[in-house]
C-alpha cells in the first residue's frame, strides 16, 4: 500500500480530534501559552506529531506548540535529556521518552506526577497495553502516559520460506536449520540467515534478553530486584555463538547496529531479521527496497520448552517537573494519548498502537495489514529492566553482550560480569 499524506487525515479522525480538543476549549487562561515539546528523533516521527500539534492549535488558538528534536538513538536522547533535566531547565514542558526512562527520570525528581489530571494509575492505564501499568507507574504515581508502542519483531522473507517449503520456525534451533536450508538452496554467499544487533547499542540489551526470556526466565522481579538465572543466560549467549559458527549469523555481528539490519534486509541479503516496528515501513516504502511485498512477521522463537517473548519498547509523554505550564501541558497530553491519536499514528505511520482495540480497527488494518499479527506479540511482550539506574544497567548488558559476540569474553565470563555488576544496582 502507498502511504497517505499525513495531512489528509480521515474525516472520522478530524471530527474526533476536534471533539477532544474541544475539551480544552480556548479561553483567557490559554492566552499566549507557549509550549515546547521534545519529540525525539526521526524514528519517533516528529512529522506526524506536528500534524497532531497543528490540529490541537486550531482548536486552542491561544496555544503555540514548538517542537524540539534530536538524538538518532535512544542512548543519545537519554544523554541529552539527562543533561537538560538535571539542570532543571524549564524551557521544555513535555518530553517524549523511552519506555525504560520513567523510573530513572521520576526517581531523580525530574518528572511531574500526572495523577492530578489522570486519576489513579490502575484506572488511567487499564485501557492500554498491559506493560504500561508497570513501566509508567513509579511508587504509585503516574510518571508518563503512552504515546505509541514499539516492539522487536522477527521479520522474515515469506517468499523464500514458501519457495523452499519451510514453515515458520518455533525455536531458535529450528530457525537455524531453516536458514541454513534456504542459504544452501539459494547459492548466494552474501545471504545471511539471521541478522541481530550485536554492537554495544540499546538493541544489544534485547539481543541478550530474547533467548533468556525464551526459556521462561525473568531478569528482575516486580520490585526491580535482579533475578538473573546465570545458567539460562549462558545458554542464551551460547545460542547466538552457535548460530555464528553455523554461518547463520555473520561473523562480525558485534559490529551490527540497528540500521545495518534494516539496510541489509531490504537489500535482499537476509532471510530472518530482528528489528523494531519502524523497520516495516523501510522494507515496504523505501525506493531502494528489494523486498516490498515479500515480508511477514512471526512470533519470536523460543529455546526448547520455553515461551515466546519479545522486547516491548515504546515512547511516552512525560511532563517536566520544572515546566511553568503544567495545567496546559496536562491537557495537551490528554489529547495526545487518546484512541484517536493512537489510530492516526498507526494508520499514517505504522506506529504500534498503545490500545489493544486499535490493532483490529478496520481503517488501520487497511493501511497496515500486518498489525493483525502484531497484537499478540505486543500484548505478551516484556519491558527491559525497570531501574532508576537504567543507564548503568543498559551499559553493562549491551557492552558485555557485544564483547561476548566479539569473542573477547566467554559466555560464562560475561554472565558473571553482568551478575556481579548489576546485583549492586538492582537490589
Show where each model-derived region lies:
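Short, solvent-exposed loop/beta-turn-alpha elements that line the ligand-binding surface or hinge
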Residues: 115-128, 186, 192-201, 215-235, ...
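Extracytoplasmic "Venus flytrap"/periplasmic binding protein-like
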Residues: 55, 59-128, 137, 159-170, ...
